[in-house]
Amino acid sequence: MADVSAKLVKDLRDKTGAGMMDCKKALAESDGDMIKASEWLRKKGIASAEKKSSRIAAEGAIGTYIHTGARVGVLLELNCETDFVARGDLFQGLLKDVAMQVAACPNVEYVSTEEIPVDVVEKEKSIEMGRDDLSGKPEQMKAKIVEGRIGKRLKELVLLEQPFIRDSSMTVAELVKQVAGKIGENVQVRRFTRYTLGEGIEVDQTDFATEVASMKTA
């Protein structure tokens, strides 16, 4: 892989509308060749996806996924720009895949990092700052370590940051961007809810032997 300059990355971004990191990777994979890098982005469905992301996505669909055994269920809203696209196989396939992803990730609570409340971030920071292994370290070093740990922890809570269950080489965010590029519309994961059978219900734990004994004496 070739080293690429910041100017090349910027030029490719201006040309394709793809993200900076995607452009850098495309150029590295293409030995700095702009034409090949553009083709690489198109094949990945990334080219122009960033430009589409600024357009309003008010159509779409609400999908469901019920896991085998019917113990976990998911409702998920996926948005696009037109009803025609919402009915298409690519969009419906993405809807199913992302809903399945939510079912497989019990720790996920938010769609994106921007949705994480400030108080949640501060709480995580407070917990990490109090770790025994950080005691005695300089404040600047401690802050840097905590920032890294928090970043990793917060990613675990975010749907778009998860490795895609069908292809761990990409994240859910990259999957959505790829499909958006193929469809030619802005596609956004709006919200989701994950249900687990019996979650939140308190069940009385009765000793079976005692219960049988009480039945005999009744």
From Swiss-Prot:
It is found in: Cytoplasm. Pfam families: EF-Ts_N (PF25025), EF_TS (PF00889). GO terms for cellular component: cytoplasm. InterPro entries: EF-Ts_dimer_sf, Transl_elong_EFTs/EF1B, Transl_elong_EFTs/EF1B_dimer, Transl_elong_Ts_CS, UBA-like_sf. Its main location: cytoplasm. It comes from the Bacteria. One of its GO terms (molecular function) is translation elongation factor activity. Keywords: Cytoplasm, Elongation factor, Protein biosynthesis. Residues 82-85 are annotated as: Involved in Mg(2+) ion dislocation from EF-Tu. Associates with the EF-Tu.GDP complex and induces the exchange of GDP to GTP. It remains bound to the aminoacyl-tRNA.EF-Tu.GTP complex up to the GTP hydrolysis stage on the ribosome. Belongs to the EF-Ts family. This is Elongation factor Ts. It comes from Prochlorococcus marinus (strain MIT 9303). The lineage of its organism: Bacteria, Bacillati, Cyanobacteriota, Cyanophyceae, Synechococcales.
